[in-house]
Amino acid sequence: MEVMRVLHMNKGNGETSYAKNSTAQSNIISLGRRVMDEALKKLMMSNSEISSIGIADLGCSSGPNSLLSISNIVDTIHNLCPDLDRPVPELRVSLNDLPSNDFNYICASLPEFYDRVNNNKEGLGFGRGGGESCFVSAVPGSFYGRLFPRRSLHFVHSSSSLHWLSQVPCREAEKEDRTITADLENMGKIYISKTSPKSAHKAYALQFQTDFWVFLRSRSEELVPGGRMVLSFLGRRSLDPTTEESCYQWELLAQALMSMAKEGIIEEEKIDAFNAPYYAASSEELKMVIEKEGSFSIDRLEISPIDWEGGSISEESYDLVIRSKPEALASGRRVSNTIRAVVEPMLEPTFGENVMDELFERYAKIVGEYFYVSSPRYAIVILSLVRAG
């Protein structure tokens, strides 16, 4: 699988588009807002003389969420400046995603964004006719590598992106007295599960650790000393990588695929060969890589649960949510649409565009049945880091 080519959300404004099915991701951005505001306040307080701030949103995607994080950042800086008795700095904003992302959608949304910024911020440096401004640019490329000039950024944000890997993991194998890489042996699955071999678990963990180290090292070159990052992404609370919150959405999708294979609609060998470029890391893994890379200190690390539809969950409401059968099936369809908007471009090259409707109809039913007997949750990592130096 060429991850750079297929890792993008469903484009456009259709019923299966990411633009129409990204409420969960929007809620994850909102979940991290408090930590982001806190980090921005600390950044502004420690850089009182700075007149131009470099900001990057990594993995911005497309659709209504693509400018949500940046809007929040601009609003927070605008609200902080009067309290800190300082002028609003010039904001250099970079929106990043892979080249396959629908940047046309983002560009078409920018005039409305600029109008809102200018209309809301006149008199504080954002108005028309001069003064400090907000400049937005697109930067296509993988964040698993350098994207920006050295020490050009002050604040980096990323939401719902770092659980995606740079490539499908490979396993190590012995051949003629030498170690080689080989495809994973993960029969009947599309992600690690309780029945996956330990070699698959190890390969996924190693790929994430390698990618996250590269991500940190790349950002360490681009951020100024004292610069900050706020990252939110799917993770897990358990050391076990096969718990429900870290892998069960993939387990149910594999069930839908296998049901189609048994009916001869798709080939089972294609399921065996497909592995999702995804990993839900534990806090222990994150701390280990951050310490090993050595350029950042952890200011805050939180893990918050949300349900599969994107709703936040308090500790008091963590018990099973009772749903009627129609409610459960409706939830299953909403979750299926959300997952489809994200993973369909990955699945199509292997299984074919013509089976996608049938696949996600089955997936919706399977997820709906699961909602009837369970209340599945994701674990959202919210990580605030400070560049050392």
Swiss-Prot record:
Binding annotation for Mg(2+): N186, D272, F274, N275
Tissue and organ distribution: Expressed in rosettes, cauline leaves and developing flowers but not in young seedlings.
Keywords attached to this entry: Cytoplasm, Fatty acid biosynthesis, Fatty acid metabolism, Lipid biosynthesis, Lipid metabolism, Magnesium, Metal-binding, Methyltransferase, Nucleus, Oxylipin biosynthesis, S-adenosyl-L-methionine, Transferase
UniProt subcellular location: Cytoplasm; Nucleus
Binding site for S-adenosyl-L-homocysteine: Y18, C60, N65, D97, L98, S142, F143
EC number: 2.1.1.141
Pfam families per the UniProt record, alphabetical: Methyltransf_7
Cofactors required: Mg(2+)
Main location as per UniProt: cytoplasm
Catalytic reaction annotation: jasmonate + S-adenosyl-L-methionine = methyl (-)-jasmonate + S-adenosyl-L-homocysteine
Enzyme class: transferase
Cofactor, free-text remark: Binds 1 Mg(2+) ion per subunit.
Residues binding jasmonate: Q25, H163, W164
Database matches in SUPFAM superfamilies: S-adenosyl-L-methionine-dependent methyltransferases
Annotated pathway: Lipid metabolism; oxylipin biosynthesis
Induction conditions: By wounding and methyl jasmonate treatment.
Domain of life: Eukaryota
GO molecular function per UniProt: metal ion binding; methyl jasmonate methylesterase activity
Gene Ontology biological-process annotations: fatty acid biosynthetic process; jasmonic acid metabolic process; methylation; oxylipin biosynthetic process; response to wounding
Job of this protein: Catalyzes the methylation of jasmonate into methyljasmonate, a plant volatile that acts as an important cellular regulator mediating diverse developmental processes and defense responses.
Family from the record: Belongs to the methyltransferase superfamily. Type-7 methyltransferase family.
PANTHER family attached to this UniProt entry: S-ADENOSYL-L-METHIONINE:CARBOXYL METHYLTRANSFERASE FAMILY PROTEIN (PTHR31009)
Name by which UniProt lists this protein: Jasmonate O-methyltransferase
Organism whose genome encodes this protein: Arabidopsis thaliana (Mouse-ear cress)
Protein encoded by which gene: JMT
